[in-house]
């Protein structure tokens, strides 16, 4: 595994997981308020 690839992928993965977490949290709130 190339270390440069990891350095590039890490922020992308972090941003993607953060976005998914936020979307899931908002979806749960919408689902509860129904």
UniProtKB/Swiss-Prot annotation:
Record-level GO cellular component terms: chloroplast thylakoid membrane; photosystem II
Stromal side: 24-34
Transmembrane annotation, as ranges: 5-23
Alphabetical GO biological process terms: photosynthesis
Pfam family, one: PsbY
Keyword Transmembrane: yes
Keywords: Chloroplast, Membrane, Photosynthesis, Photosystem II, Plastid, Thylakoid, Transmembrane, Transmembrane helix
Lumenal membrane side: 1-4
Superkingdom of origin organism: Eukaryota
Molecular function as annotated in GO: manganese ion binding
Topology versus the membrane: Single-pass membrane protein
Main location: plastid
Protein's cellular compartments: Plastid, Chloroplast thylakoid membrane
Subunit text: PSII is composed of 1 copy each of membrane proteins PsbA, PsbB, PsbC, PsbD, PsbE, PsbF, PsbH, PsbI, PsbJ, PsbK, PsbL, PsbM, PsbT, PsbX, PsbY, PsbZ, Psb30/Ycf12, at least 3 peripheral proteins of the oxygen-evolving complex and a large number of cofactors. It forms dimeric complexes.
Reported function: Loosely associated component of the core of photosystem II (PSII), it is not always seen in crystals. PSII is a light-driven water plastoquinone oxidoreductase, using light energy to abstract electrons from H(2)O, generating a proton gradient subsequently used for ATP formation.
Entry's family note: Belongs to the PsbY family.
Name of the protein in its database record: Photosystem II reaction center protein Y
Encoding gene (name): psbY
């Amino acid at each position: 595994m190339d270390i440069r690839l990891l350095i590039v992928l890490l922020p992308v993965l972090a941003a993607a997981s953060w976005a998914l977490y936020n979307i899931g949290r908002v979806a749960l709130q919408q689902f509860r308020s129904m």
